[in-house]
Regions:
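Extracellular "leader-to-stem" segments immediately downstream of a signal peptide or signal-anchor
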Residues: 1, 17, 40-42, 46-64, ...
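Extracellular beta-strand/beta-solenoid scaffold signature
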Residues: 1-7, 22-34, 52-76, 91-104, ...
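Detector for repetitive beta-architecture
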Residues: 3, 12-18, 25-27, 36-37, ...
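Extracellular beta-strand solenoids
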Residues: 8, 21, 30, 44, ...
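Core solenoid repeat modules with strong leucine/isoleucine-rich periodicity
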Residues: 72, 85, 109-141, 146-152, ...
Length: 320
């Protein structure tokens, strides 16, 4: 447990793997990451401290009350091509926060896969995204009573795509522009509207609403709603208060497509490892100078000889 779990200051290639934490303030915070970073198999919840058995550990009710009033699970400012997979956040004021660097307009783009958030005030809070956008797939965002599964702040003006995502709770957008798209998504429980789009643009493709009413609310500044085979049994209910929105609803079997597969195993159970700790360095002929210089010598026979030497020594690693 910690006040802050992991903080990435301006840098590149951070890698947070197989981590379980209770952070009272922020679980993971990313600033100005200028090359691909990864968050994989991370759990952020008040229960880890509460159930740790450590001296002075609080009750689950007490620590959850604090994190739900103050905490953020995963906070991503500018990051260029962040990859997040198998992230679970529960019991925080904000589950996942995406937005700008403080005092600047720099924002992230990222791919999120198997991100699951529940019991948070805002499951996902999007302040802003850079022009390359955010893709979120095979994930879920669940809100408590009176909370939002997803919220888009007024600075949002680019692109977020949800594919194969389950929502419990409303999605609310006050973004000034931009496109929010939903493909093969499911909208379960929500109070009045599943989608309350006060401004901006929304696209729906083959989405399933579990209630017969309250699907989409369009505010005065909504520009576009386009829907294909979406709604309750493919019937979409729209409450249109826009001044001039372009609304198009299409249904038909010819527009049906295969949804993104679920429960895909993205990692092998046992990673390969060398038979021994032996390491052999092979210093082979190679190109010199800039990357566009071509090598002139065939080293395949020497490379095979080096591999054979490693094998004869009982296995190991060949370092080039």
């Amino acid at each position: 447990n910690a006040y802050n779990g992991f903080n990435s200051a301006p840098s590149e290639l951070h890698y947070v793997l197989d981590s379980y934490m209770t952070a009272l303030n922020k679980g993971i915070e990313v600033h100005v990451c200028t090359d691909i970073a990864r968050i994989e198999n991370v759990r952020i919840s008040p229960e880890y401290w509460a159930k740790s058995g450590l001296p002075g550990a609080p009750s689950l009710a007490d620590v959850t009350a604090y994190t739900k009033a103050n905490g953020t699970g995963y906070q991503m400012h500018r990051s260029d091509w962040e990859y997040v997979s198998d992230l679970l956040v529960s019991g925080y004021k904000t589950g996942v926060w995406i937005g700008r660097e403080p005092g600047f307009a720099d924002a992230p783009n990222a791919q999120l896969y198997e991100v699951h958030v529940d019991g948070c005030g805002n499951g996902l809070y999007v302040e802003d995204v850079n022009p390359y956008g955010i893709l979120i797939s095979n994930s879920s965002f669940a809100a408590g009573e009176g909370d939002n599964a997803v919220y888009f702040y007024k600075d949002f003006s680019t692109s977020v795509q949800f594919n194969g995502v389950d929502f419990n709770g409303p999605i609310v957008s006050d973004g000034r522009d931009g496109v929010i798209s939903f493909e093969s998504c499911t909208f379960n429980e929500y109070p009045d509207y599943a989608l309350k789009i006060n401004s901006g643009n929304v696209l729906l493709s083959q989405c399933d609403f579990k209630k017969s009413t309250g699907h989409v609310y369009l505010g005065a500044d909504t520009y576009t709603l386009k829907s294909v085979n979406s709604g309750y049994k493919s019937k979409l209910q729209i409450d249109n208060h826009s001044t001039a929105a372009d609304v198009e609803v299409i249904t038909g079997k010819k527009y049906t497509f295969a949804p993104i597969p679920k429960n895909i195993k993205t990692n092998i159970a046992v990673h390969p490892k060398p038979a021994s700790d032996n390491v052999l360095k092979a210093d082979l002929a190679r190109a010199t100078g800039y990357n566009n210089n071509r090598p002139t010598r065939d080293v395949s026979a020497e490379l095979q000889s080096a591999l054979d030497a490693v094998k004869a020594a009982g296995g190991g690693t060949l370092y080039l």
